[in-house]
């Protein structure tokens, strides 16, 4: 597929070790050149108590951009959790980057090959993720984050 690497890291290659296979991918850094923090770091750490103030005004937009990207390119996520999403603030337009948990974990990954099924699964997992992490209010989904209807 022609999927741009705007919200997932660039793929560098496959690493094969005895009994293991791994993927080498782009390292997402923050403005200072350190590994970018995850949403989990921001939401549950003493070091980052809550969403960074510099991004709070655009929080809904950050989540909407990530959802739109997953939905548009039918990128099914099997493990949508806060620790798998990094905050890339290197540019004037910060973004969320999904670094792990991509793909279907079913024996027959129908959602990966049938966009209609994939998009239904993406929306269902997204809404569950937003509500589970209290990023939406459970009603309209507009006060604390972005939820699809």
Label the model's feature ranges.
Residues 1, 39-43, 122, 126:
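Generic structural signal of hydrophobic/aromatic residues within well-ordered alpha-helices
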Residues 46-63, 69-78, 87-149:
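C-lobe/activation-segment region of protein kinase-like
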Residues 29, 82, 103-104:
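Short, glycine/acidic-enriched loop or turn micro-motifs at the edges of active sites
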């Amino acid at each position: 597929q022609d999927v741009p690497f705007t919200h997932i890291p660039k793929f560098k290659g496959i690493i094969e070790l005895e009994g293991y296979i791994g993927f080498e991918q782009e390292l997402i850094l923050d403005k200072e050149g350190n590994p970018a923090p995850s949403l989990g770091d921001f939401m549950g750490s003493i070091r980052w108590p809550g969403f960074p103030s510099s991004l709070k005004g655009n929080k809904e937009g950050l989540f909407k951009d990530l959802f739109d990207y997953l939905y548009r390119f039918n990128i099914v996520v099997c493990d949508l959790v806060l620790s798998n999403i990094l905050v890339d603030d290197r540019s004037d337009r910060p973004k969320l980057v999904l670094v792990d948990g991509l793909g279907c974990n079913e024996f027959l990954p129908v959602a990966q090959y049938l966009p209609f099924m994939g998009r239904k699964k993406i929306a269902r997992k997204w809404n569950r993720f937003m509500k589970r992490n209290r990023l939406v209010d459970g009603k309209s989904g507009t006060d604390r984050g972005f939820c699809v209807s």
